[in-house]
């Protein structure tokens, strides 16, 4: 029932109802100014009183009703666990809140009603404007049609009569406007709506219904709840996405604004390589801007592409930033420590390297100084790795000796010995004079900048000629004191001991001149002389301490290996607590065998040691990878070499195991020297230690023999090698190993072809024989012809074919040889273009085996 009917029945008796319904509208607001009105119906329970009047207002409650209400309040308070006063206070607060909500809803309803009226007025004005525009268009169209009709036919009589009837039609909208105004006036007066007004509302409803709305999807998306309907949407906050978009637009505007807003220049840290995405983050720039800049430079790169430090510095400079370049090698900064002060230095023992040609008596001389017999224990009587010893003289002075090999294969060892030494003793045999390795030792000593003391050995032999030695040394800028120079020369004999005291005195004098000092009270550093894998002890490195004191428990880094020093052992096998400057010791505790020549340094912590070794391992792998890529020829290059007739190198793969790292290195270098362009010995794996099963499996997969130098294979490896057919060769002298490899490489060389001339034959007649082809009837004009020999067909002294002789017959018999002046029949292999008058040249090819020099 409507409010109008309720007001009309106010004079009579109100009907008795249980529930009163009050309806209202709630406006739901959306973004972009859109809104939606929703009808909300609230049901209120009407209190029933004991006595009622006709006016519907209840009278005062009876005492029994009041007692009942009080009893209900007491029961409800007891149920909720609160007092009656608290319950009444809560009810009062709820009633006040309901009153406030009703007041707020009333204000909102009034505001919405005003907005509805304003919107209705705007819609009416827009409708009137559209109708006026349509009427104007219709009028112009009719005028144009009238002009065209008048021009087309002036004789028609019916046209002028039809034209006036078209004018009232154009005046129809004003009538409709009048009806609409009349309908609106009737509605405003509260009376019933007339039929034309209802038709006008229906037309407007259809027009609004057919008009598409932009917010249909948005209005249907949200679900209306009572909380959202009663809530105040006037203070809606912006979403985070909207705020982010606004900030992005503002930043784009600033970037596009040019130089109006200068960007802050920051310092960018650049490693050796960096991705564009990481570079953009460090510059606080967008990745798209960096990629766009590279595109302008002609580089099609993506965000995850890597650029070097130079390119990254160029990019950062273009964006107005400064750079600070860092490198992975920075982890080694400060590794060697600072220089020592003069007041901290103390005298140390000189380090003397004995160098010279093989079999000139270097080790025997050292044995005479040490009163030992090291040479007797050397395989083949030659030294094959560096020996480090410290000798105490009768005067109490100490001298550290390094005994280097004299064989040509140990060039690297001699170079390391010269670099780690203070004084070089050049040993020259009096009966053999200067030899190639003597010259090489002189070059190493001069390159290292160390003084030389010449020791002329074997001077007690009957064919000794020390004067020739001194004269030959003049060719290499070694001028001894006897000839007006500064180099000391001493004649010694290791067998009789003659001249040993003079030699030690010369070393002491030279050490005093050099003023050798070191600081023992600092962290130690030195050089690795030799390394090996010892069964039961693990990796063992022979170390020569240069500065500081190496103690047990120190954390050391040696090349790409690190470890904690577990034990220090001298050359006599005694355990040491520490090792001072110029003292050679064996160090146990490393995680691997370092390369000879690597520096060994004490560091503060295991973390620092791991960081340094990881960097060195990465660097070593990178260098090895670059070398393998450079050495590996692509398929196109190989095909081009074959097409050009170039020689393709044949390789002999070898798995090499040695007792010490220096021996493995020396053998590898010697194998490289005996290799040629045609054949090459390639060490696919060279390591220290015994032969294991993994070595056998590697040799089997590579079809390579295993060369063992002073090491042996365990039982499991021997059994596996026998099953797999892998050859293991054992050597104790480097000469024998190199000779076997040289013989194997010689067998891989292609034989040399040598051609021998046999004779000439003239073609007198050509016969065509079935199943044989063309046969030439010839006369031998010079030399002889042999069956199966090589032939060349000459026509006008031009070679037109080269091949082999297929048949050689005299009359009907097959013969092996035809001499000069005799006639015979010849046929060529897979060639028939022979003519009368051609000449045949016969020759024989011999293959001669080649050997490596």
UniProtKB/Swiss-Prot annotation:
Indicate whether Cell division appears among the record's keywords. no
Which positions are annotated as binding GTP?
356-363, 403-407, 457-460
Any idea where this protein resides?
Cytoplasm
Pfam families the UniProt entry points to: EF-G_D2, GTP_EFTU, IF-2, IF2_assoc, IF2_N
Q: Which InterPro entries match?
A: EF-G-like_DII (IPR053905), IF2_assoc_dom_bac (IPR013575), IF2_II (IPR044145), IF2_N (IPR006847), P-loop_NTPase (IPR027417), Small_GTP-bd (IPR005225), T_Tr_GTP-bd_dom (IPR000795), TF_IF2_bacterial-like (IPR000178)
- Give the residue ranges for region: G4: 457-460
- Low complexity composition-biased segments: 163-176
Residue segments, region G1:
356-363
Q: Where is this region: Disordered?
A: 1-68, 94-265
- Which spans does this entry mark as compositional bias, Polar residues? 20-32
Primary localization class, coarse? cytoplasm
One GO cellular component this record assigns the protein to is: cytosol
Q: Does the keyword Transmembrane apply?
A: no
Q: Which GO terms describe its molecular function?
A: GTP binding; GTPase activity; translation initiation factor activity
The superkingdom listed in its UniProt entry is: Bacteria
Keywords for the protein's UniProt record, in alphabetical order: Cytoplasm, GTP-binding, Initiation factor, Nucleotide-binding, Protein biosynthesis
Compositionally biased region (Basic and acidic residues):
94-161, 196-219, 245-265
Region ranges (G5):
493-495
Region annotated G3, chain positions: 403-406
The record's region (G2) falls at 381-385
Tell me, what does this protein do in biology?
Answer: One of the essential components for the initiation of protein synthesis. Protects formylmethionyl-tRNA from spontaneous hydrolysis and promotes its binding to the 30S ribosomal subunits. Also involved in the hydrolysis of GTP during the formation of the 70S ribosomal complex.
Q: Family per UniProt? A: Belongs to the TRAFAC class translation factor GTPase superfamily. Classic translation factor GTPase family. IF-2 subfamily.
The protein's name is Translation initiation factor IF-2
